[in-house]
Curated annotation (Swiss-Prot):
It comes from the Eukaryota. The chain crosses the membrane at residues 6-22, 34-57, 74-93, 195-212, 232-261, 427-447. It is found in: Endoplasmic reticulum membrane. This is Membrane-bound acylglycerophosphatidylinositol O-acyltransferase MBOAT7. GO terms for molecular function: lysophospholipid acyltransferase activity; O-acyltransferase activity. Residues 1-5, 58-73, 213-231, 448-472 are cytoplasmic. Pathway: Lipid metabolism; phospholipid metabolism. Acyltransferase which catalyzes the transfer of an acyl group from an acyl-CoA to a lysophosphatidylinositol (1-acylglycerophosphatidylinositol or LPI) leading to the production of a phosphatidylinositol (1,2-diacyl-sn-glycero-3-phosphoinositol or PI) and participates in the reacylation step of the phospholipid remodeling pathway also known as the Lands cycle. Prefers arachidonoyl-CoA as the acyl donor, thus contributing to the regulation of free levels arachidonic acid in cell. Its EC number is 2.3.1.-. It is an enzyme of class 2 (transferase).
Length: 472
């Protein structure tokens, strides 16, 4: 592991005992204590580059104050424009930020765009209320008022997920501050249930990255290996990539769980990133609070089992980096300048690649996803319904295998980063996933789409496994 990876791990691990300290604290101590810890971590890891996050926060707050009715689009333009400046600093002859600064900036961008959207929703609701002349009560998830500058700073620098996620809305943050009877919210047992696979994933990461180092792919000797060996190598590389993020995101979720952050009654049917989808009145007594069943779906960032064993490329996206996927769906996909599912997905993947960075490998990887989505959707609707139950089960296993190989292939761009290294590797395996996706798309178009009833009856199974294994 690199020194940077050790630093990330230490930050994640110390967040767990800190969470237990803050869990039962009052709103004021939670707000300012969590912000002080987060700011301290930022200053320690980023040093003077912390100024970038401060400038981004102040700029967004100014836009919210100046144009509350359109601040969402303005905040999106401002934060994404600042990302371009932030990543071009070395080209401008300015000091290059640390990797930790980049991590803080990425999560901060998501939080500030979401905050602006929540403020805009509040402004629209207030205007509708004034026009109608009566109040219907606060809609689900609406903010009580526009956050002040200090409140915006406290949300932005809250230590929870400050470098690794999960992303959370300001409404989720407020619910944590104002959580009634936090002592009744379970933490230790949910944390242990969530944390148990992390040591195994960590060992698998160390083993796979040692046996199959990524640097080997950049060496000329690698391309003298036979084709089967080159094809196989992307499998353990992506495996190590997954194990690394599984450990990081599970540890980040455990930090949230320790603090009771993102805990809602199961009846609220919370979604990762978005929070509750059903109104659930707060408990009126400690006994009532203790009788409720809670979950931490709001801050759930990874579903390890379904990431590995779901059938389709589309499902695989849904279970990976789940809170960020919610953000992309809510703020990018829904406002995409196209109506086609594939084109909207391409737009979303383009901005996702930009959010990650300027390395060409990001764009090569992310912009391969829409092709895979189009291919699997077209072939699914044209062919799967023609098969019997046994044939559909076999189809799903083959589909799952190809989905995993597609992600293996695309991950090489994500980890190799450069245009030369990515294209060199893909060329060495004859751009197999691109060729296969184009062939599947062509076959699906040639066969045509099935009838609506047939497509519905031939819907893919959620997983090729016989039963659904959950980690919690």
């Amino acid at each position: 592991m690199s020194p940077e990876e050790w630093t990330y791990l230490v930050v994640l691990l110390i967040s767990i005992p800190i969470g237990f300290l803050f869990k039962k604290a009052g709103p004021g101590l939670k707000r300012w204590g969590a912000a002080a810890v987060g700011l301290g971590l930022t200053l320690f890891t980023c040093g003077p580059h912390t100024l970038h996050s401060l400038v981004t926060i102040l700029g967004t707050w100014a836009l919210i104050q100046a144009q509350p009715c359109s601040c969402h689009a303005l905040a999106l333009a401002w934060t994404f424009s600042y990302l371009l400046f932030f990543r071009a600093l070395s080209l401008l002859g300015l000091p290059t930020p640390t990797p930790f600064t980049n991590a803080v900036q990425l999560l901060l961008t998501l939080k500030l765009v979401s905050l602006a959207s929540e403020v805009q929703d509040l402004h629209v609701a207030q205007r509708k209320e004034m026009a109608s002349g009566f109040s219907k009560g606060p809609p689900l998830g609406l903010l009580p008022d526009v956050p002040s500058l200090m409140e915006t700073l406290s949300y932005s620098y809250c230590y929870v997920g400050i470098m690794t996620g999960p992303f959370f809305r300001y409404r989720t943050y407020l619910d944590w501050l104002e959580q009634p009877f936090p002592g009744a919210v379970p933490s230790l047992r949910p944390l242990l249930r969530r944390a148990w696979p992390a040591p195994l994933f960590g060992l698998l990461f160390l083993l796979s990255s040692h046996l199959f180092p990524l640097e080997a792919v950049r060496e000329d000797a690698f391309y003298a290996r036979p084709l089967p060996a080159r094809l196989f190598y992307m499998i353990p590389v992506f495996f190590a990539f997954r194990m690394r993020f599984y450990v990081a995101w599970i540890a980040a979720e455990c930090g949230c769980i320790a603090a009771g952050f993102g805990a809602y009654p199961v009846a609220a049917k919370a979604r990762a990133g978005g929070g509750p989808t059903l109104q659930c009145p707060p408990p009126s007594s400690p006994e009532m609070a203790a009788s409720l069943e809670y979950d931490y779906e709001t801050i759930r960032n990874i579903d390890c089992y379904n990431t590995d064993f779901c059938v389709t490329v589309r499902e695989g996206m849904r279970y990976w980096n789940m809170t960020v996927q919610w953000w992309l769906a809510q703020y990018i996909y829904k406002s995409a300048p196209a109506r086609s599912y594939v084109l909207r997905s391409a737009w979303t993947m383009l901005l996702s690649a930009y959010w990650h960075g300027l390395h060409p490998g990001y764009y090569l990887s992310f912009l391969t996803i829409p092709l895979c989505l189009a291919a699997e959707r077209q072939l699914e609707s044209a062919l799967r319904w023609r098969l019997g139950p046994g044939g559909q089960k076999a189809w799903d296993w083959v589909h799952w295998f190809l989905k995993m190989r597609a992600y293996d292939y695309m991950s090489m761009g994500f980890v190799l980063l450069s245009l030369r290294d990515t294209l060199r590797y893909w060329a060495s395996v004859y751009f197999c996933v691109h060729v296969l996706a184009l062939a599947a798309l062509g076959l699906g178009l040639a066969l045509g789409r099935g009838g609506p009833g047939r497509r519905k009856s031939g819907a893919p199974a959620p997983s090729p496994a016989s039963g659904k294994l959950r980690e919690e």
